[in-house]
Amino acid sequence: MAALQALVIYTIILFFPKPEQASVPTVDLSIFQNLQQVVYHVAQSGLIIQEERDHVRPSWEAWIHITSKRRAVLALYLLHWSYSVAKCVPSFNCRELGFMPAPAAKMLWQVSRKDEWEPLYDRWLIRWEGNEYLQQEFWEIEPGVMIDRRTQKWLEEADEFGILLMSLGNYVSLHHLQLGSSSGIVLTIHQ
């Protein structure tokens, strides 16, 4: 886990300019391929724990570990996406992460003690009735003023990271629709 989080930090340092640089540096595309291979390896080691599949409360420690792992993977995708916007290069297709739960509720993520977290998680499980919100649902949000009940329910609990992901997913989906593409998410940025 520490290595994955370090990779997020190193990626930030690599992708974004120092104050004295005028623009984002160009990075060798092989770095992105290697980064994606790391993410694939991490995904193969598991991004969901059995308790989540069984819709029961995991241990606090296991939940922190898996939630942190998912956030680090999503952060790497977001970092690559932001670089791709700056350099007009294709971004990773994050649909392969659609099976993962969306970022955890703020109330669960910010609790710092196990004895506080356990009853909150139990209430959260009851609220979602074993059918938690998944990443893929971000791409299914229909454009318009109203959002579906599940998305609204998730938004009521979301933290800043989750809101960022949902906003970008919605933005990308809208551009995807406007471009008329029928394949995976394709970012086209007009500068």
Can you say where each PLM-predicted feature lies in the sequence?
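C-terminal transcriptional activation/regulatory domains of eukaryotic transcription factors
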Residues: 1-20
